[in-house]
Amino acid sequence: MRFEDQMKKAAPEQLWQEYCGFLDMSISEYMYTQRRLMAEQLSLWTPSGLGKKLLRGEAPRTIEELRAQLPLTTYEDYAEVLLPKRSEMLCTEPAIWIQTTWEGGLRPIKQAPYTRSMLDTYCHNLIACMMMATATRKGTFHFRRGDRVLYGGAPLPYATGLMPSLANEEIRLTWLPDSNEHSDLSFSERIKKGFAMGM
């Protein structure tokens, strides 16, 4: 159910618990959750082509085994798979490829695959951020359908370009300026236009 519809049926406190309940976790509860999620990712990633390549045939079953078998990596370790967008090497087909700069612009770009599951998590976290940003106290937040939001992020194919479309899957907001209508504007032009529209 969309967040917009949930707002009509559930008490604000219930929504707060669903999206921001992690704030009440103890450090041990939080770490238990993080370890469980990491174990899920490990089981998905290990048998993938990229997992096999980086692990050199090893199959770690725990986070500790992964740390022992695979030291810290850099984007360089993934570049030959991610730059040409070799999705057959990944554990899940990407829904979209996002790009960002690499080494402060010394190299042209980095590509990163985002699965539908990652987009859902991104959206959930975005709603949680909006709840916390508009909260006056725990369980009380103030944003509604149609609220105007100054959009100061870079457009797609950058990660911030996902915000308007993902948020609008859950709650219809008015983005200033609309990222689809004004995608041809430069970053500074969009910021100026957004401020002008908001005044």
Predicted regions located by residue number:
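Nucleotide 5′-phosphate-binding alpha/beta core
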Residues: 1-99, 103-199
